[in-house]
């Protein structure tokens, strides 16, 4: 993965690199490869993630339909 450094602006190049790595899922993969995960633990984690996604989707849909109040925004 390459990032162009313009005008010796290393901070901006690092931000761009981190954003690219985040989009590609490199941080998640590094965390997963840090230690072995048993297949049963992997299934349990994936199931929990699926449940979390389903709840989030249902909550967003209920907010759109007006059944739940929306997020409170700081003024």
Curated annotation (Swiss-Prot):
Which cysteine pairs are joined by S-S bonds?
none
* Keywords noted in UniProt: Ribonucleoprotein, Ribosomal protein
Q: Name one GO cellular component term.
A: ribonucleoprotein complex
The GO terms describing molecular function are: structural constituent of ribosome
Return the Basic and acidic residues bias intervals: 33-52
| InterPro entries given in the database record | Ribosomal_bS21 (IPR001911), Ribosomal_bS21_sf (IPR038380)
Which biological process annotations from GO are given for this protein?
Answer: translation
UniProt region (Disordered), positions on chain: 33-75
Could you tell me which Gene3D superfamilies the record lists for this protein?
Ribosomal protein S8
Q: Quick one: signal sequence residues?
A: none
Protein family membership: Belongs to the bacterial ribosomal protein bS21 family.
Q: What is the protein name stated in its UniProt record? A: Small ribosomal subunit protein bS21B
Q: From which source organism is this entry?
A: Chelativorans sp. (strain BNC1)
């Amino acid at each position: 993965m390459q990032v162009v450094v313009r005008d010796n602006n290393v901070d901006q190049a690092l931000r761009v690199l981190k954003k690219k790595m985040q989009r590609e899922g490199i941080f998640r993969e590094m965390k997963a490869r840090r230690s072995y995960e048993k297949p049963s633990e992997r299934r349990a984690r994936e199931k929990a993630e699926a449940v979390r996604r389903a709840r989030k989707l249902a909550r967003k849909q209920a907010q759109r339909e007006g059944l739940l109040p929306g997020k409170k925004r700081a003024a």
